[in-house]
């Protein structure tokens, strides 16, 4: 255990409190973004049943989420570069968008509203990545690899624990 201590010390050596706070906040936010963006897939069997959807409609929900995310990530990257001082607004907007999307899907009375919610999930995911990565690259110019890899761990943890936690919630409560 003590052999690893110097390596961990080297990992964070020379990084100030503000930088560590930013890295921690963006990593935790990345966890939340991936958790939120994967919730829809976990709820799809229940949405299909409640809204009496076909397999094609369920596939279209996923396509809308991914299509909107793919289309807007390039736009989001352009905006993150154009409005450099608004990085916090982009990442905050991402989390708010994802919360709004899940609310819309949760109260959705129809397939159409579920598609709207899926599109908002795609938009929220697209808002996060360019702004967060730009912020980390600027804050850690000599340690971009370290900062971006720690940020990536947040995504992996969100992807890993999301299904377990959401599955437990769905077992205890309704998907809505």
State where each predicted segment sits.
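Extracytoplasmic
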Residues: 25-55, 76
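Short hydrophobic/alpha-helical segments at membrane-entry points of transmembrane helices
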Residues: 26, 112-118
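Small-residue-rich segments within alpha-helical transmembrane domains of MFS-like 12-TM solute carriers
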Residues: 34, 38, 122-130, 160
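Residue-level signature of mid-helix packing/kink "hotspots" within the transmembrane helices
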Residues: 38, 66-74, 159-160
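Interfacial helix-cap and linker-helix signal at transmembrane-aqueous boundaries
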Residues: 47-48, 79-80, 168-173
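Conserved MFS/SLC helix-loop-helix module at the cytosolic interface between two early adjacent transmembrane helices
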Residues: 71-109
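Cytoplasmic helix-loop-helix junction between adjacent transmembrane helices
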Residues: 117-154
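Helix-loop-helix hairpin linking two adjacent transmembrane segments in secondary transporters
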Residues: 155-176
